[in-house]
Amino acid sequence: MQTEEANAQRNALRARVLYLWDNVVAVSPARHVVLLGHGTGCDALVHLVGHRAVRDKVRAAILVLATNPIPLVPKNRQELRQWYWEHSRVYCPHDHPLYAFGEQKTSGKRLGRTQQCQERHPEALLPAVLGDMAAFIEAQVKGARAAASANGAAPTEKPAALEPAAATA
């Protein structure tokens, strides 16, 4: 059970991420946004996905967890669950409770596309998955560009080398 202080911190982080989305990302011309959450910041990003219309801008949602529970997209939004499944990567350490004890297995697509990593130490997980993350982001952006081109949309700007996105937590 979470303490009042932990709940207050979680809610404050969620509010900051929503504020950044509403006042920076949503009003920017950017069309290829990548959300990257690490540790406890993952909850705030999944909260954002469930509470704002992010699908037109966000090409990838990447979570790098420790042993904390995997945040879930809302159960009652089938179209969002499908989108999240297609656009997410959730990297978990080797001994994450999902794999060690089968926790959350019944949550299905609401978990995103989870990947059990060989790395056992959460603090070493991010450097271990950087190459896979970069390949996933590149594939997602290329797919979005191909879809836009097929639909007759004007080409978008060329991406800079994978630079940090505006909305990271």
Annotate each PLM feature.
Residues 2-28:
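Alpha/beta-hydrolase active-site loop
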Residues 43-48:
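Hydrolases whose catalytic domains are alpha/beta-hydrolase-1, hotdog thioesterase
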Residues 1-2, 38:
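Chromatin/DNA-recognition segments of nuclear transcriptional regulators
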Residues 36-42:
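Gly/Ala-rich beta-loop-alpha elbow adjacent to hydrolase catalytic centers
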Residues 149-169:
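Intrinsic disorder/low-complexity signal
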